[in-house]
Curated annotation (Swiss-Prot):
It comes from Polynucleobacter asymbioticus (strain DSM 18221 / CIP 109841 / QLW-P1DMWA-1) (Polynucleobacter necessarius subsp. asymbioticus). Coiled coil: none annotated. It is found in: Cytoplasm. Pathway: Glycolipid biosynthesis; lipid IV(A) biosynthesis; lipid IV(A) from (3R)-3-hydroxytetradecanoyl-[acyl-carrier-protein] and UDP-N-acetyl-alpha-D-glucosamine: step 1/6. GO terms for cellular component: cytoplasm; membrane. The keyword Transferase applies. This is Acyl-[acyl-carrier-protein]--UDP-N-acetylglucosamine O-acyltransferase. One of its GO terms (molecular function) is acyl-[acyl-carrier-protein]-UDP-N-acetylglucosamine O-acyltransferase activity. Keywords: Acyltransferase, Cytoplasm, Lipid A biosynthesis, Lipid biosynthesis, Lipid metabolism, Repeat, Transferase. The lineage of its organism: Bacteria, Pseudomonadati, Pseudomonadota, Betaproteobacteria, Burkholderiales.
Length: 265
């Protein structure tokens, strides 16, 4: 049975699974869908065309599904889609998309989003990410699986953050972070491979060593960007006997090759 506090305001058109909990003074809009097992704390607002999956937890005073902070926005029915088992803490803001992009802001599964985080319009967040308190990402940013955002970090619009990358606290990021790389600084720069994080995720020592070598080729060997891409592609081919390592090297190569904003240097 849905447990809705008497002081909460839930629009009659909202679709809530039978076991959803809504705390005191929260507001749920007419175009909201919330899946089984999700809990909404007190004083939280969920509005817009927002679809939320199963077993999510929203703490107090979160603002979810509000209109994008984009001066071109004219009220188009854009969306926010949130997956399963996410934890979204106090005073977090997550906005719907814009028609200038795909029209969808998307949050995957199993993400840990701490207090005062801002996820802007059209952002695409993968699975198992961590957003530390006060991390802020601008519109159209992509955050891939297992990435970690340090507290009080800020990310420029259209930037991509690769799988298993880590952005240090209070950093300002204006270009892409390749997968597996640590970045930090008031103009974020590379600080090596996220070795401890990869070990915790079960990466083999051979794969970690290969990724450190790819990092060296890209950042330490004095090669041009184009020449570094060629050398890393050779490393992919040379690792064909170890498919896991070859796959991770290919991810590293393909990410930097696809960059339009450029990568951190």
């Amino acid at each position: 049975m849905t447990r809705i506090h008497a002081s909460a305001v839930v629009d009659s058109k909202a679709e809530l699974a039978s076991d959803v909990e809504v705390g005191p003074f929260s507001v749920i809009g007419p175009n909201v869908k919330i899946g089984s097992g999700t809990k909404v704390g007190s004083h939280t607002v969920i509005e817009g065309h927002t679809t939320i999956g199963k077993e999510n937890t929203f703490a107090h005073f979160a603002a979810i599904g509000g209109p994008p902070q984009d001066m071109k926005y004219r009220g188009e029915p854009t969306q926010l889609i949130i997956g399963d088992r996410n934890t979204i803490r106090e005073f977090t803001t997550i906005h719907t998309g814009t028609s200038q992009d795909l029209g969808i802001t998307r949050i995957g599964n199993d993400n840990w989003i701490m207090a005062y985080v801002h996820i802007a319009h059209d952002c695409q967040v993968g699975n198992h990410t961590i957003f530390s308190s006060n991390a802020q990402i601008a519109g159209h940013v992509q955050v891939e699986d297992w990435a970690i955002m340090g507290g009080m970090s800020g990310v420029h619009q259209f930037v991509r953050i690769g799988q298993h990358a880590m952005l240090g606290g209070a950093s300002a990021l204006v270009q892409d972070i390749p997968p597996f790389v640590i970045a930090a600084g008031d103009k974020a720069s590379p600080h090596g491979i996220n070795v401890e994080g990869l070990k915790r995720r079960g990466f083999s020592s051979e794969t970690v060593t290969a990724l450190r070598q790819a990092y060296k080729v890209l950042y330490k060997d004095g090669l041009s960007f184009e020449d570094a891409k060629v050398e890393i592609q050779k490393m992919v081919a040379a690792s064909s006997g170890d498919q896991a390592t070859a796959d991770k090297l290919a991810q590293f190569h393909d990410f930097i090759a696809a960059s339009t904003r450029g990568i951190i240097r």
